[in-house]
Swiss-Prot record:
Keywords: Cytoplasm, Lipid-binding, Nucleus, Transport. Pfam families: ACBP. This is Putative acyl-CoA-binding protein. Its main location: cytoplasm. InterPro entries: Acyl-CoA-binding_protein, Acyl-CoA-binding_sf, FERM/acyl-CoA-bd_prot_sf. It comes from Schizosaccharomyces pombe (strain 972 / ATCC 24843) (Fission yeast). SUPFAM superfamilies: Acyl-CoA binding protein.
Length: 87
């Protein structure tokens, strides 16, 4: 991982406010795609709603390269820093 990506991952924890649910899902999916690659995990069970949302968000990025996901993650964190500010 690039130092820029690692800094973005650290910065997101220092936002003044917690991003909304959709933003958190996007952050999660981009982070997983950038660090792991395509989702190859089993789909969560019917009662695990949070797990299913996270799994689906990551699954939607299937085929995106780790590099592209990392770049998109960095850009998205920059948007969130502008929107929410830093602590």
């Amino acid at each position: 991982m690039s130092s820029t990506f690692e800094q973005a991952a650290a910065d997101v924890k220092e936002l003044k406010e917690t991003p909304n649910s959709d933003e958190l899902l996007k952050l999660y999916a981009l982070f997983k795609q950038a660090t792991v690659g395509d989702n190859n995990t089993e789909k969560p069970g019917l009662l695990d709603l949070k797990g299913k949302f996270k799994w689906n968000a990551w699954e939607e990025l299937k085929g995106k390269s780790k590099e592209d996901a990392a770049s998109e993650y960095i850009s998205f964190v920059d948007e969130l820093k502008t929107k929410y500010g830093m602590k």
